[in-house]
Amino acid sequence: VQRYMPELFETEFDHMKELADELAAHLIVRLAQNADLRDFGKHACARLDSFSREYPFIQYLYLTDTKGSLKCAAITDPAYREKYEALPIGFDFSQREWFKMPMQTGDMHIMDVYQSQFTGKLVITVSCPVTDDDDNIVGVIGVDIQLEQLLKRSQALQQEARAAED
């Protein structure tokens, strides 16, 4: 049956994507709750830098305001810095799915796996609204995560997620 109706069966790739989604979701939600992100200033940019250094599978980490204007970003691999710098501060992301969905729903959004135009690697983009103390959306944080690198670290990340829940 699987041979003739493969859509009815979960593939290894589907399983890997689910795992990646779960792990990435834990990380981005935790980061989005950080109060430093709300001011869009030097504290926000410093927090993005330190977070991306902590998780080297992050390819690109970025913060926008509610209009989709890029406020700060962290590029983890120096080899890609020049390519990503084509997206300057103030770049308009307002028409991108990863920005629009959290603004419309107020919830985290996970995109399907795709090939990065900057690195050629398979990535998933996870985005989440950043809210103030009254739960008003003040911005959106997004992260492009290299699928291969995330899966290599999956066991350690699962342990970290369980520890955070306790």
Regions found by a protein language model. Name each.
Residues T119-Q158:
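Conserved beta-strands of PAS-like sensory domains
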Residues F40-F51:
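Amphipathic alpha-helical coiled-coil segments that mediate homodimerization
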Residues R38-K42, D92-F93:
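Conserved phosphate-coordination/catalytic loops
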